[in-house]
Amino acid sequence: MSKRYAVILAAGQGTRMKSSLYKVLHPVCGKPMVQHVIDQLSRLDLTNLITVVGHGAEKVKSHVGDKS
């Protein structure tokens, strides 16, 4: 069986959104945007899920936790 990986690009300030909340943490249908991606990827048989964070990394990491 081959190893399958997924990478979530969750870096960016979201300055064009005119908000102090980091882009990937903006709620869509009651969940942060990044959570929708994690939920979909968790349905796959992945070896590893990697999340790339940048600006606001601590807040994104605290939401993502050990899911990625």
UniProtKB/Swiss-Prot annotation:
Pathway: Nucleotide-sugar biosynthesis; UDP-N-acetyl-alpha-D-glucosamine biosynthesis; N-acetyl-alpha-D-glucosamine 1-phosphate from alpha-D-glucosamine 6-phosphate (route II): step 2/2; Nucleotide-sugar biosynthesis; UDP-N-acetyl-alpha-D-glucosamine biosynthesis; UDP-N-acetyl-alpha-D-glucosamine from N-acetyl-alpha-D-glucosamine 1-phosphate: step 1/1; Bacterial outer membrane biogenesis; LPS lipid A biosynthesis. UDP-N-acetyl-alpha-D-glucosamine binds at L9, A10, A11, G12, K23. Pfam families: NTP_transf_3. Keywords: Acyltransferase, Cell shape, Cell wall biogenesis/degradation, Cytoplasm, Magnesium, Metal-binding, Multifunctional enzyme, Nucleotidyltransferase, Peptidoglycan synthesis, Repeat, Transferase. GO terms for biological process: cell wall organization; lipid A biosynthetic process; peptidoglycan biosynthetic process; regulation of cell shape; UDP-N-acetylglucosamine biosynthetic process. Its EC number is 2.7.7.23, 2.3.1.157. Catalyzes the last two sequential reactions in the de novo biosynthetic pathway for UDP-N-acetylglucosamine (UDP-GlcNAc). The C-terminal domain catalyzes the transfer of acetyl group from acetyl coenzyme A to glucosamine-1-phosphate (GlcN-1-P) to produce N-acetylglucosamine-1-phosphate (GlcNAc-1-P), which is converted into UDP-GlcNAc by the transfer of uridine 5-monophosphate (from uridine 5-triphosphate), a reaction catalyzed by the N-terminal domain. Homotrimer. This is Bifunctional protein GlmU. It comes from Priestia megaterium (Bacillus megaterium).
